[in-house]
Swiss-Prot record:
Keyword vocabulary terms for this entry: Repressor, Ribonucleoprotein, Ribosomal protein, RNA-binding, rRNA-binding, Translation regulation, tRNA-binding
This protein's GO CC annotations: cytosolic large ribosomal subunit
Example of a GO MF term: rRNA binding
Role, per record: Binds directly to 23S rRNA. The L1 stalk is quite mobile in the ribosome, and is involved in E site tRNA release.
TM region(s), chain numbering: none
Subunit structure: Part of the 50S ribosomal subunit.
Gene3D superfamilies: 3.30.190.20, 3.40.50.790
Family: Belongs to the universal ribosomal protein uL1 family.
PROSITE patterns assigned to the protein according to its UniProt record, in alphabetical order: RIBOSOMAL_L1 (PS01199)
Domain of life from the UniProt record: Bacteria
Protein name stated in the entry: Large ribosomal subunit protein uL1
Cited SUPFAM superfamilies: Ribosomal protein L1 (SSF56808)
Amino acid sequence: MAKVSKRLKALRSSVEANKLYAIDEAIALVKKAATAKFDESVDVSFNLGVDPRKSDQVIRGSVVLPKGTGKTTRVAVFTQGANAEAAKEAGADIVGFEDLAAEIKAGNLNFDVVIASPDAMRIVGQLGTILGPRGLMPNPKVGTVTPNVAEAVKNAKAGQVQYRTDKAGIVHATIGRASFAEADLKENFDALLDAIVKAKPAAAKGQYLKKVAVSSTMGLGIRVDTSSVNN
């Protein structure tokens, strides 16, 4: 049996098993438990009352976190003409068209988000087998296929996160870093929750927000009392 580290033992002793914590207390505990030698991300999971096997109950979207993610996001944009200049002015790291597609085919994927204007999708579509598995394929549902690429770039740089239900009907997303103030993490949590609640499918029946948990990269998961969140 693997030995349990002193750090993990200390973390476990700070959390009551099976207890549901108010969201403010959960965030405080996550910050306290984030003792790794790097700035851990703070992540949240929402277990939703949807049937992800049905296409009309798959939740997907994006939201700009008011306090950002604490991460520098590199943005690549497929567009041309005036849109290309606007994307550069908005802060895009890479802007191109056929030339950018060639770079990607050559294995150069030094970016975190891909944005495309509608006219570029005929080119981007050829990159599905490269971008798709990496979660980089532009999609209008999350605002990454848009005629207003400049605004999309600004959103990505400002701390936009994408969310989507997995096969178990759970949404996983990052709401910041352990170095963030508790109030800032709570504000980001509320923004994400609000977006997910607004995205509730009409076909979803029964309790929508079933379980919530907050954790850090190397910390324990803290279960949240759903009655303590503003949904």
